[in-house]
Structures are given as C-alpha cells and as structure tokens.
From Swiss-Prot:
Its EC number is 2.3.1.47. The keyword Protein transport does not apply. The gene is bioF. Its cofactor is pyridoxal 5'-phosphate. This is Putative 8-amino-7-oxononanoate synthase.
Amino acid sequence: MNQTWRAHLQCKLQQLHEQGQYRDLHVTEKAEETWLIRDKKRMLNLASNNYLGLAGDERLKEAAIACTKRYGTGATASRLVVGNHLLYEEVERSICDWKGTERALIVNSGYTANIGAISSLASRHDIVFSDKLNHASIVDGIILSGAEHKRYRHNDLDHLEKLLKMASPEKRKLIVTDTVFSMDGDTAYLRDLVQLKEKYGAIIIVDEAHASGIYGIGGAGLSHIEKNLSQKIDIHMGTFSKALGCYGAYLTGDEIYIEYLQNMMRSFIFTTALPPSTLGAVQKAIEIVKEDNERRENLIANGEYFRTKLRDAGFDIGNSSTHIVPIVVGSNEHALRFSKRLQEAGIAAIAIRPPTVPVHSSRIRFAVTSQHTIADLKWAIDRIIHIAKEEELFV
C-alpha cells in the first residue's frame, strides 16, 4: 500500500479514537423484533427505526417473496433504461393517493432522495434556507448544489424570517426542513414555515422520513395533520425504511417538480432501480399503515409514556414530543459509558456523537415502537434510572 496514504489514514483513525468518535460494527440478529441479539447478548431493542413493527410482518414477507418468484431478484437496470417495472408505476400511484399529490418518484434511499433533489433544484444562483438540525443528507445536498447556504437556528422562525428578508431578491429561495428531527424527536412548525415561504416567494421541501406512516390521516405524514397544509408544501420526501419496515424512499408533489427531478436528478438517473421484492413489500406496507390506526396509536402512547417517565426522573430529553427520545449527556465519554452500561444491563441503546449531533450534545437516542409493551418500557426505565444514579452522571 502507498505509505503516504497509510500514514495519513492511520493518523485520522487515531484521532477518532482519541476524540471518542471511532465507530465500529456489531453483529445484530433479530433487529426486526422487540428483543434483539447483539454481540450474542439478548437486549430490549430501543435503537431501531422499525417504528410500527412492520419489518418482520408476515404480510410484507409474503408480498416480497411473491414478487421475487414472479419477477426475479433484481431490477436489471436503472429506471430510465429497462428497470422501470410495472410495480414502480403501481406504488407511485399509491403514494399519490396516500399523500394527495399529482406525481411521485421512487428512489433508492432517503439519503439519495435528499442529496439528489436539492442538488438538482438549487444552483449557485439560488439560496437554500435550512434548519440547523436538519439531517446530513439535506446538508450534503445543499453543498453539492453550490447554492448559498443559510442555516437558521433550530425551529427559530424569527431567525429564518430575518435571513429571508436579507436575501437578494434576484435569487430563487428554497426552504428545507425535517418534519420530525431524527436526533431530537421534536417537530418543525410547518404551518409557520409555509406562511414564510408564501410571504417571501420561496418553495419548501419537507423530509418526512421519521413521520411517514405515523402522523396525519392514514399515516400520510406530519404535513397531513392540519387541514389544507400538505397541498401548500411543494415537495414531500419520505422513506419506506422506517415506519413502513422496508427500504427506499419517495419524492412527491406537483407534476412539474417530479418531471424535472426525473430528468435531472443524478442519484436517480445513474443507479440501478430497487428490486421487485422491495416494491411488493412497500405496496403492502402502504396498504397496512393507511388502515391500521391501532399501531400508530400504540406508538404515540408509548412515546408519551417513555418521555414522561424520563423527564419526571430528571433527564434532559430536550423538546422531544415523538417516539424518538434522547437523553442528552454532553461529552462523548459520558455517552459511550452510559451506552455500554445500558447494553450490559440488556438495553440496546446507542451513543450518538458528533458529527451526527452538535459538539457537546452527545446523547443516548432511544426509539420506542408500537410493539413495545408498557412492561417493556417500565423495565427499561427502571434500569436507565438505576444506572444513571450509580454512575452519578445525570440524576
């Protein structure tokens, strides 16, 4: 190996170790279940994004198997070549019916959806206004676009309006936000954001990755909680990999936006399409979440119970109002130690560190699901409190 490169990489890895930011992989089994096996130890799963428990649902498995048997294991090409299977058309129609939009485009992941859409729509002639806690894929899309990047303080709409007022009138404006923030569990003020985008002549993209399948009518997303709000949002992005228990993502909105992305989005054009098995499972998952209110209600109730108990115990859970509940501890060292103790106690809960979250805000990110019982959550809470007191860290 080239010795110059070896020395450089070894130095960088050593720095990660010293900063408490080194990451490694752990073998995990049964992650689709409430109790998983990690490094051969049974643990309560409080770390996955299988929010509605659909990743292990027999109906999705059967749909995936049926499509594999009928259509094979691969798409064989990109969608613009010969990979645009009839299943794509069917699922995209289902998304439009679900979201109340004109057209949809299925892509391979939430990450590729965001980097592709933002970098295709925006250019050096434009300004993108982005919440400071938006997902990395949004940030990367803005960087790729070459647009002027204005980050407003998290959920601070006065700051956003100030930036909009200061923006050059010659530049097109794009506002982009998560709806449920993935590391904090709080939500965007969508109604106010829409009012600002209309007032200042911008368009808005919302990332519903952690809200699709959970909130709004039929689980269509946070943008569907308020009447007539969703139609005022220009582009909706959502994933199939979280509440829907599958893989992939979608972009949906007015015809003109989706037609443009189909023709200009490099992360869509230059990649092989998703396999038929995934599309079959996604179609079944959409059918289920539109009708199964009980799963959504269980998830929301579990999130409320877990948040309340942790907050009452004295933990800093920020402004979480959803199924994602962080305990913010500050340093990498504290987060890693807490995570290690939790896993030793049988709780799968992972330390989240910079650059995923801001410096000095390392945390344990818990994610409850609809499949957890109150007994599961009480068992976990008791251990979380006990370990925190024992370590003299937080309570």
